[in-house]
């Protein structure tokens, strides 16, 4: 489409009314750098939407008039950078256009205190109110499908997510990791003010945060006083340095798997922020649900897209069931069962088709465990206390370092109750029976009557939901997704969106 520059709010309204396309919106305050380039190009490469970049230096975000006047303004270069990196439209309103002096109906918003009273909010009184006010105004003018923001301003990102939620705005927030310069400091429009010596100080600050992150991975704890002493020894002026829960911005607790170490320092007249995320282990996605709800297919695709390990716990129970049949062992005989559990090895291996094969005691049983014979007994075997204890322990060993997506019936309640994202995937019995029938047909399995399949699924549901040990139930904090009428890709995309909303992009880099 033709490149467009718009400067008036009435013009942007008219343009919006006449364009029949979804919009990716990238709000900026100008003086664009490589971080902005990445934001714009990420939006451009994500979809076929129209990319709109706004350039507006919002006076409500500044502490004083001097700070506003000194903010770098490079509009001609900003226009060039925006178009070169994928912008289709640039909106460059004046202050009078956004905050007309004769308009008494401007909506001035307040940022939520629970998110704005710590970190930058301690000393920048009213700053986040200004952010909310201008972004809300721009969103109502532009009505975008997606809003692209950087994780460098993590607190601002949380506050804007809250704004979208509380105002019930129909826009999806997409974030990108903090972008860093060649020497490791976060890219910022204010970096142009730094002298060589001041840049060395911010580099030392950012380096110490990374050192703290590395130490945390080993020791699972952090020593704030020690970090502050190191920074103070370099005569670095610390505005704040805090270790907090990344989403509530309250003091981090021992049981938190993920936390944020965030700080702000002053170098001369320039104030700069940086942060790192601290994780005891990589994230875990737990997907539970009844038979035929699509768990296996969905989980495999999610694992592939997010580069996570796929832990098919159901296959582990099926593999054990297969072995008991092969060895002609009566699972009701406790001693024989205990003996065989001592010598069981279940391993997952990738095959040449980029799929996952299941091995039990060196037997590849990927296809065999999906037979109707196995399906008819696996629920009974999985309800045996010794079997569940053994396999749950094996699953937890696999998940000690995280970085996986697991599916089953008790993942979020028993195996990984501390998973970052819990999904309860379900569908009607009719839908699940149709899927099972189609699946069996595609694998050239023996034809099975649809009515019989429904009865088998009902029976399996009852057994799974009523077993004494680890019954199939939805975890209190699980998000239920009903998949009737949804394509596999729609379900996968929804779960990945939920994952991206809960897990910072910076922690997903592998």
UniProtKB/Swiss-Prot annotation:
Gene Ontology cellular component terms for the protein in this record: cytosol
Q: Which pathway?
A: Cofactor biosynthesis; (R)-pantothenate biosynthesis; (R)-pantothenate from (R)-pantoate and beta-alanine: step 1/1
Annotated region described as Cytidylate kinase, given as residue ranges: 277-510
Where it mainly occurs, coarsely classed, is cytoplasm
Q: Does the keyword Ribonucleoprotein apply?
A: no
Q: Read off the SUPFAM superfamilies from this record.
A: Nucleotidylyl transferase, P-loop containing nucleoside triphosphate hydrolases
Q: Where does (R)-pantoate bind?
A: 61, 156
Residues bound to beta-alanine: 61
Q: Which UniProt keywords apply?
A: ATP-binding, Cytoplasm, Kinase, Ligase, Multifunctional enzyme, Nucleotide-binding, Pantothenate biosynthesis, Transferase
Q: What reaction does this catalyse?
A: (R)-pantoate + beta-alanine + ATP = (R)-pantothenate + AMP + diphosphate + H(+); CMP + ATP = CDP + ADP; dCMP + ATP = dCDP + ADP
Name residues in a coiled coil. none
List every stretch annotated Pantoate--beta-alanine ligase: 1-276
User: Which Gene Ontology molecular-function terms are recorded?
Assistant: ATP binding; CMP kinase activity; dCMP kinase activity; pantoate-beta-alanine ligase activity
Offer one example of a GO biological process linked to this entry: pyrimidine nucleotide metabolic process
Binding residues annotated for ATP, in chain numbering = 29-36, 150-153, 187-190
> Main role?
Catalyzes the condensation of pantoate with beta-alanine in an ATP-dependent reaction via a pantoyl-adenylate intermediate. Catalyzes the transfer of a phosphate group from ATP to either CMP or dCMP to form CDP or dCDP and ADP, respectively.
Q: What is this protein called?
A: Bifunctional pantoate ligase/cytidylate kinase
Native species of this protein?
A: Prochlorococcus marinus (strain MIT 9312)
């Amino acid at each position: 489409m033709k490149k467009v520059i718009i400067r008036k709010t009435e013009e942007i309204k008219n343009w919006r009314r006449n364009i029949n396309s979804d919009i990716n919106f990238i709000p900026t305050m100008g003086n664009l750098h490589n971080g902005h380039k990445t934001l714009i190009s990420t939006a451009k490469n994500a979809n076929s939407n129209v990319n709109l970049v706004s350039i507006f230096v919002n006076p409500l975000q500044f502490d004083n008039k001097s700070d506003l006047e000194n903010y770098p303004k490079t509009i001609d270069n900003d226009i060039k950078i925006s178009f070169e990196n994928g912008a289709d439209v640039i909106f460059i309103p004046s202050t009078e256009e956004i905050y007309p002096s004769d308009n008494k109906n401007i909506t001035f918003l307040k940022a939520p205190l629970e998110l704005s009273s710590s970190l930058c909010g301690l000393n920048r009184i009213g700053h986040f109110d200004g952010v909310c006010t201008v972004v809300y105004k721009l969103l109502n003018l532009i009505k975008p499908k997606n809003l692209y923001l950087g994780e460098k301003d993590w607190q601002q990102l949380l506050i804007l997510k809250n704004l979208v939620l509380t105002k019930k705005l129909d826009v999806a927030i997409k974030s990108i990791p903090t972008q860093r310069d060649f020497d490791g400091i976060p890219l910022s429009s204010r970096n142009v003010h730094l002298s060589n010596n001041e840049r060395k100080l911010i580099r030392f600050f950012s380096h110490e945060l990374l050192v703290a992150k590395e130490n945390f991975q080993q020791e699972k704890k952090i020593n704030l006083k020690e970090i502050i002493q190191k920074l103070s020894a370099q005569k670095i002026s610390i505005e704040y340095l805090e270790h907090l829960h990344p989403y509530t911005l309250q003091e981090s607790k021992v049981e938190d798997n993920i936390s944020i170490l965030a700080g702000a320092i002053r170098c001369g007249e320039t104030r700069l922020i940086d942060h790192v995320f601290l994780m005891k282990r990589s994230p875990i996605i737990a997907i539970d649900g009844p038979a035929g709800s699509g768990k296996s297919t969905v989980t495999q695709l999610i694992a592939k897209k997010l580069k996570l390990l796929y832990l098919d716990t159901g296959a582990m129970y099926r593999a054990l069931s297969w072995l008991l049949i092969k060895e002609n062992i009566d699972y009701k005989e406790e001693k024989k069962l205990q003996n065989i559990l001592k010598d069981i090895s279940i391993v997952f291996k990738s095959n040449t088709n980029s799929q996952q094969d299941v091995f039990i005691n060196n037997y590849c049983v990927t296809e065999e465990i999906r037979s109707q014979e196995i399906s008819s007994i696996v629920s009974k075997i999985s309800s045996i206390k010794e079997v569940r204890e053994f396999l749950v322990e094996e699953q937890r060993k696999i998940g000690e370092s995280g970085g996986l997506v697991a599916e089953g019936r008790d993942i979020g309640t028993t195996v990984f109750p501390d998973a970052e994202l819990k999904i309860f995937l379900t569908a009607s019995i009719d839908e699940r029976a149709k899927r099972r029938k189609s699946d069996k047909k595609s694998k050239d399995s023996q034809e099975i009557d649809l009515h019989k399949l429904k009865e088998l699924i009902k029976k399996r549901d009852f057994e799974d939901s009523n077993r004494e040990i680890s019954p199939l139930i939805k975890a209190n904090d699980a998000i239920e997704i009903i998949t009737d009428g949804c394509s596999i890709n729609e379900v996968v995309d929804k779960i990945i969106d939920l994952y991206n909303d809960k897990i910072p992009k910076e922690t997903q880099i592998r």
